[in-house]
Amino acid sequence: MTKENYFKVGTIVNTHGIRGEVKIMAITDFAADRFKKGAALQIETKQGFVPVTVQSSRLHKNMWLVLFEGVTNINEIEKYKTNDIYVYGEAREALGDDEYYYDEIIDSRVVSLSGEAIGVVSEIMTTGANDVWVVKRPGQSDALIPMIDDVVKSVDVANKLITIDVLEGLLD
């Protein structure tokens, strides 16, 4: 099974009720589009991807409650509890300048303007005003890099290389 053109948009964390709805914890900025009626998704299983189509969805307590077409009761969907949900690559929305998908940033190398290696992005935190990239540094505590123009100077998605201006106190 290759995941090359598939992008994770959430995880089925539980079932909801007896009619076959699932609770999905979304990890996408486009959750309303990803889980709208008619959306084509893929459930990852040990045997490969299982295609599903959204019949209905709604936001409930920061989780998406989703019912897939053809599912009429909990027994048909319970086996997918804890499985990840993906969208096929061609279904991704086009982003504007200075906007990136998580998988384009995660595992990117971070260097200073002078080329000094700082670490590798391991996580992205959504804080409200701007995202914060968690950078794993060898032998040091993680660095928190705000995704703002004053700090992030360039993002080379193809080479997974991010150049930042190390402002005073940023890496302390």
UniProtKB/Swiss-Prot annotation:
The protein's location, in the record's own words, is: Cytoplasm
> Which Gene3D superfamilies does the protein's record reference?
PRC-barrel domain, RimM
- Keywords assigned by UniProt, alphabetized: Chaperone, Cytoplasm, Ribosome biogenesis, rRNA processing
Please give the GO cellular component terms listed in this UniProt entry.
cytoplasm; ribosome
Domain PRC barrel residues, every copy: 97-170
* Pfam families associated with the record: PRC, RimM
- Biological process according to GO: ribosomal small subunit biogenesis; rRNA processing
Molecular-function GO term, any one: ribosome binding
Superkingdom of the organism of origin: Bacteria
Report the function annotation for this chain. An accessory protein needed during the final step in the assembly of 30S ribosomal subunit, possibly for assembly of the head region. Essential for efficient processing of 16S rRNA. May be needed both before and after RbfA during the maturation of 16S rRNA. It has affinity for free ribosomal 30S subunits but not for 70S ribosomes.
HAMAP family for this protein: Ribosome_mat_RimM
Family named by the database record: Belongs to the RimM family.
Q: How does it assemble?
A: Binds ribosomal protein uS19.
Entry comment, domain topic: The PRC barrel domain binds ribosomal protein uS19.
Q: Know the name of this protein?
A: Ribosome maturation factor RimM
